[in-house]
Amino acid sequence: MEFKHQTVLLQEAISGLNVQNNGIYVDCTLGRAGHSLEILKHLPNGKLYCFEQDEAAIVVSEEILQKSKYRNYEIIKNNFVNLAAELQLRNVKAVNGILYDLGVSSPQLDDDKRGFSYRYDSPLDMRMNQHQGLTAKTVVNTYSQEALVKLFQDYGEEPFAKVIAKTIVIARNEQEIVTTFHLVEIIKKSLPQKILKKAKHPAKRVFQALRIEVNQELFVLQESLRQATTLLAVHGRLVVISFHSLEDRIVKKYFQSLTKDPNYEINQQLPAISYFESDYHIITKKVIVSSVTEQTNNHRSRSAKLRILERVK
């Protein structure tokens, strides 16, 4: 199967990075190299480090980059939670920009063997790194009913989490749940007809929750962002593209925490002025979203949100 991937918010992300031609940059989510290629166009005398843990993506991106004229890059085959450690191994102490393009890519969704999509009948896998142990099949068949409820509520914001979890437990007691379509069928049985008639696919929230759990996406994001901000050089930029509210909330709150006076509540009660000056500045006071044209051409860009942080001292 041939997979197509359209890079989301490409020019907005590159503009946000404010690429210096001799700088050091990191693409934490190489994918199909869309953002990386664009960064390299602006980086004739610098270096780009590209993180990717998905072997299928690495094979494709290596081929794409090898066909380009650029050689000032290195692909790091690791999860971006290991950002600081991998750069330390390369004696990189500070960088001028870091980019995250979060979530599952179009080729991953369209791969009928990976289990990311509820639109294809495939094994319940959902691993970004196919060498890790935990799969969606393990979660669905071994987690307690209470754990599944919490998972669907916290990571999927699923209003019918309780009844879906209960139906899953009943179903797996009769037969192990091993495919995406089997799980979709169980979810549909759990929901009222008025929900099934809505445009949004009834399994969307549950699949999101399972994917986040399998790949520990929210923990990994929080930990990697913490490392990223400490690695930024003065005037370095951190650009993050997210695709659902849980990710965007983490990014937004983390950026705010870096720029807000830690004694804000105390200072509010005092007549004196606060002398707090943050090391960071939020460039995007208003989140950047895809244009109407991009949304028309690539429907997966509709949920994309881009935020930018700059280190100022």
Swiss-Prot record:
GO molecular function, one term: rRNA (cytosine-N4-)-methyltransferase activity
Annotated Gene Ontology cellular component terms: cytoplasm
Record: residues binding S-adenosyl-L-methionine: A33, G34, H35, E52, F80, D101, Q108
Entry's EC annotation: 2.1.1.199
Enzyme class: transferase
Catalytic activity: cytidine(1402) in 16S rRNA + S-adenosyl-L-methionine = N(4)-methylcytidine(1402) in 16S rRNA + S-adenosyl-L-homocysteine + H(+)
Organism domain of life: Bacteria
General function of this protein: Specifically methylates the N4 position of cytidine in position 1402 (C1402) of 16S rRNA.
Protein name per the record: Ribosomal RNA small subunit methyltransferase H
Organism: Spiroplasma kunkelii
Gene coding for it: rsmH
